[in-house]
Amino acid sequence: MMQAKSNIILASASPRRVELLSSAGIEFEVVAGDVDEGLLSGETPEDHVVRLARAKAEDVARKSGGRFYIGADTIVVCEGEIMGKPKDSADAERMLNKLSGIPHEVVTGFAVYDKERDGVITDAVRTRVYFKHLRDEEIRAYIATGCPFDKAGAYAIQGGAAYMVQKIEGSYSNVVGLPLCEVVDALRRMGAIE
């Protein structure tokens, strides 16, 4: 277990991010942030996720008494389209049809914010994901599980959509929702863990 030098708060209610950070042996608390996740005009995918990650960390920092805050945001980018979480079944079906048989990228931005020093480390990590060709009935069956609705791009690589993925290039944990290697390095650089 990595020893935290001060309390660390994950500014996310995502069970996947909680599981990933726990797997690194880091002690932390969870307090969900509440920010507008809309895309700003002219914003690149990396700028978008880093801005939201930082906003989530700073939002939670204003409301709680910890020292170090981790914010994160994940999107899928396919043929220039930025995909967040689907609005409904039709949107999930549209996203999965678009991802079917072609590569796309998962982009996660994170921020490690030190409230005491008002310092922040941010970064965005890209992972290329290759989907197999999906049949319409596969897409409908997956949507019927309810799994797509709280996930960028309407799928969870660590869950029911694992069979859809032919290969990935880059960080697996990034696709799940938190680029663990980079986040742990940032926590060390910030002095949050030993």
UniProtKB/Swiss-Prot annotation:
The record marks R16, T74, Q158 as: Important for substrate specificity. Its EC number is 3.6.1.9. The active site is at D73 (proton acceptor). It is found in: Cytoplasm. InterPro entries: ITPase-like_fam (IPR029001), Maf-like (IPR003697). Keywords: Cytoplasm, Hydrolase, Nucleotide metabolism. Coiled coil: none annotated. Its cofactor is a divalent metal cation. GO terms for biological process: nucleotide metabolic process. GO terms for molecular function: dTTP diphosphatase activity; UTP diphosphatase activity. SUPFAM superfamilies: ITPase-like. It catalyses: dTTP + H2O = dTMP + diphosphate + H(+); UTP + H2O = UMP + diphosphate + H(+). GO terms for cellular component: cytoplasm. It comes from the Bacteria. Its main location: cytoplasm. PANTHER family: BIFUNCTIONAL DTTP/UTP PYROPHOSPHATASE/METHYLTRANSFERASE PROTEIN-RELATED, BIFUNCTIONAL DTTP_UTP PYROPHOSPHATASE_METHYLTRANSFERASE PROTEIN-RELATED. Nucleoside triphosphate pyrophosphatase that hydrolyzes dTTP and UTP. May have a dual role in cell division arrest and in preventing the incorporation of modified nucleotides into cellular nucleic acids. Belongs to the Maf family. YhdE subfamily. This is dTTP/UTP pyrophosphatase. It comes from Geotalea uraniireducens (strain Rf4) (Geobacter uraniireducens).
